[in-house]
Amino acid sequence: MTRTLQAVANPFADLDLDRLRRRTSAKWRYYPEDALPLWVAEMDADIAPPIIAAVTDALELGDTGYALGHACARAMAGFAVDHWGWTFDPDATANVTDVMTGIVDLVRLVSPADEAIVLTPPVYPPFYGVAKKLGRTVVPARLGPDDRLDSASLEAAFAEATAGGRGAVLLLSNPHNPTGTVHSRAELDEVARLARHHGVRVISDEIHAPLIMPTSTFVPYLAASDTGPDLAVASASKGWNLAGFKAAVIIPGADAGPDLEPLRQPGGGHPGHIGLIAHAAAWADGGPWLDAAIAGIDANRHALADLLREHLPAARYTPPESTYLAWIDCRALGLGDDPAAAFLERGRVALSSGIPFGDGGAGHVRLNLATSPAILADAVARMASAHTTTAA
């Protein structure tokens, strides 16, 4: 079904930095006020009006009890059909507190304690935290030089992880954080083929799936071939800036439904009712706002290329195909393995260090594009000042 959507203005076009500094979330409170924060994945935009309305209505009604049902998954299912041409059964899903909680639960449920976790570095640092929390060995399958999944690397990692007849789990970032790569259907088909051959279960983190740039097409992992034993975890958290309203949905492959039964029982780690209301409103009615946000991010990702070309021409950067995260190779700037530290100390701009992303992360930074053009320009100017100070 195609919905008629009303245009919304770019939510990043005109942001008041003083107003942003009144926020008390991690992005704006972790570093001192003289540092410009473009690190953690929070947007600087205001929340989409349909979400504000849905949450306000619930609060005014006193609808603040326990969560029940699959309304959020049903709203997501409508979005998935409209935007990705993909269908899934919302009644087969399970609600969880957030994506990472869901991933920890799934690894425990589908994988014995002695099995390894395969990761595709450089990749989202909390994936390593899952392995540490559960006492698992990490087997890396490094991305290729083009920042895409590498079939040979996956084949070798799967073989190593499953040596001796064990199984293993692949934590897939789809689309990929931090590079913003959107995996193609052919690439996902190959992941599934290799996983089936080696007895690997795939858990796909699709939290950034709503944030696909106009030149790319997102393919849900479970839409690929032969993904029956696998699972995906999705959330409106990143697409609509709802990290403070925790909620996520686990979607099982065709054969994985029984694995979710323990998560449906009372007493588990379920999301709050208001969080599910906020996320359902995002999936169902947040499309126009999301389109405007993507247009703003699209403009910023290209503006960053121009700014770096002007102020830091030795930095290497390819505009991401998705997310609002820019992965910048700073190795030629002479700032060492952790250029984020130099940018913070000498330029007072806070970026994410590439080191925690694992293999291939040293010498890189991750920059948050979900801000105003003026703040983005200020950030690059601060980076350039830090580089000049270091060179001197």
Residue ranges and their predicted role:
Residues 2-98, 105, 284, 392:
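N-terminal small-domain helix-loop-helix segment of the aminotransferase-like
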Residues 38, 55, 76, 93, ...:
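Generic structural signal for small/hydrophobic residues in well-ordered secondary structure
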Residues 78, 338, 342-351, 357-392:
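PLP-dependent enzyme catalytic core of the Aspartate aminotransferase-like
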Residues 108-168, 172:
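PLP-dependent aminotransferase-like
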Residues 134, 197-198, 228, 347:
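Helix C-cap/helix->beta junction micro-motif
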Residues 145-217:
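Active-site phosphate-binding strand-loop segment of PLP-dependent enzymes
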Residues 223-298, 387-388:
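Conserved core segment of the aminotransferase class I/II
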Residues 280, 297-305, 317-330:
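Conserved glycine-rich beta-strand-loop-beta hairpin in the small C-terminal domain of fold type I
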